[in-house]
Amino acid sequence: MRNLAIIFAASVSLIFICSLRGSAQEQESSETEMKKKLEFSKNILDGLVTEDFSKILKNAEALNKLGRTKWLENESAAYRTQNQVFWFTTGTLALAAKEKNIDGATLSYTQMTHSCVNCHKLLRQL
């Protein structure tokens, strides 16, 4: 009976430790993805100031794809809304780049940045 209790306690401890490790790995993955998003955003800004539409397009499409990844397990309606705004603005940014519309691309970039700031404000509240 005592051996059974020890095995049970060890199993529970192992499950707990594995769940903590999973959370740390998820956080690390999330941080890596956010760094990629920031790098793509910086590249877009560089493309805007140099009117390099291929650079804007490439990075806007990469951001749009990356933005479709699931970031939270329990997505609130507010979070989903922020994600949709992000997808929309990265999409309009890519379209403006295809059309070589610097003013449209600049506006979309500004809207995208606003969406990023709002989403991070929301995440800090969760």
PLM regions and their residue ranges:
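Bacterial N-terminal signal peptides that target proteins for export
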Residues: 1-12
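The canonical Cys-X-X-Cys-His
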Residues: 112-124
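Extracytoplasmic c-type cytochrome modules immediately beyond a signal peptide or single-pass transmembrane anchor
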Residues: 22-113
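C-terminal segment of classical bacterial N-terminal signal peptides
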Residues: 14-22
